[in-house]
Amino acid sequence: MNYKTRIIIGVVIALIAVVSYFMKTDENPVTGEKQKVSLTVDEEIALGLQSAPEMIAEFGGEYPDKKLQAYVDRVGNKLVQSTEAGSSPYKFEFHLLADANTVNAFALPGGQIFITYALLSRLKSEDQLAGILGHEIGHVINRHSAEHIAKQELTQGLIQATDIASGDPGMISRFVGNMVNMKYGRDDELESDDYGVKYMVQAGYKPEAMIDVMRILKEASGGGNQPEFMSTHPSADNRIEKLKEVIAKYKKKQ
């Protein structure tokens, strides 16, 4: 295949990928926002339920102390029932994972939310736990996973196009992938911080605890944050400053 043919095929594949991405638009059932997503709400829920057992196994299973699991459930359900999340189509379930070494919390599409014992054991208050769970609920409500899947499909299409058209596909493919996905991660974390604070306030928790959570996470990472521009997540210090602004915003609305 000569160079001109490769370029033409690459352009066609890229155009198909871009057009397909921009045609995947749906209205968020909670926020009303128009979003580019690949999954319906029902598909999000099904994917989350299907993937949950694998995630549980990956982090050492469920934590055996049922009282601690009940504590996580109580805080999570209070957040859901006190906010718009309770009237959303998502069925939230909260999982305490047995992993005592990995400090982590995350959400799968459709309402499956996880926190490791390693993270829970570092928290000093119910308000801090509410901050973490509220943040993860924010990811679900804003359909970040569904948006991410749509962007991955776009990225894969562009990668295929550059692989065909470029003489150095590896470098260009990685560049395309990084540029498409970098802003997505940064924006979503800040948006979920915002929603986490809002849900904390609505459920009667102290939103300042989110700042304490950021400091705990920073300490757990050894303070070794990557330079913010090259990270998919804002730095802990940047998030703390943004959180102060968000907390002030929602306190004014009380």
Question: Where does each model-flagged region fall?
Answer:
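A Zn2+-metalloprotease active-site environment signal
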Residues: 1-254
